[in-house]
């Protein structure tokens, strides 16, 4: 059975089209045979043709639902409705090897790159640890079972959709500061997951913040340097190799003074 890949493509302004189409330049390196579905979201004028052509070149199905969504809402909806395992994939990912048939031991239900807790510059929050959604494998059936089990532990569970609560971005004020649960962080804290092994991590890189660099640049001390890295990768995707080491150093420098649970 072919693996499934879902991509949410957002182009808020024409200047971000490179970040929105980068993944398609190496997508079939990462997923040679997978069934790829791309959902359009918030397309700036003039960007539709570029996205449609990028999808055509890699034989990806382009879906245009006609409404705007948010990344976390989109993920939650997939988890609530899908019946087969799938990959989430961001548009600012570069592949260097195949991600198909990784052969993770045991019975995994969520596999991704571990992102440690760090002090987030843009929101001035403590960004809690999670499995990063830039490239995340999920088994929706097993995850729904895990979430139901987790939710049943409460004597009077609230009448809400637990999956949405755990997947949606959430800000939690505490005496020590605001905790930012980014997309899927609550799910990881509630039911856990599997950290992607090193031999899988070396097969891709992710351009952090590439699709929203314009929004956070005023808060970043090294915004010009980050933008230059992005520019070089758009020029030649192979230059993305090794970016993970720099991101790890960023996390180390901005690690919270206490462990976040």
Feature names for model-found ranges:
Residues 144-232:
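Catalytic core and acceptor-binding pocket of nucleotide-sugar-dependent glycosyltransferases
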Residues 84-96:
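Short beta-strand-to-loop acidic/aromatic patch adjacent to the donor-nucleotide binding site
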Residues 13-29:
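Short, well-formed alpha-helical segments that are part of the catalytic scaffolds
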Residues 2-12:
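Nucleotide-activated donor-dependent transferases that construct or modify glycoconjugates
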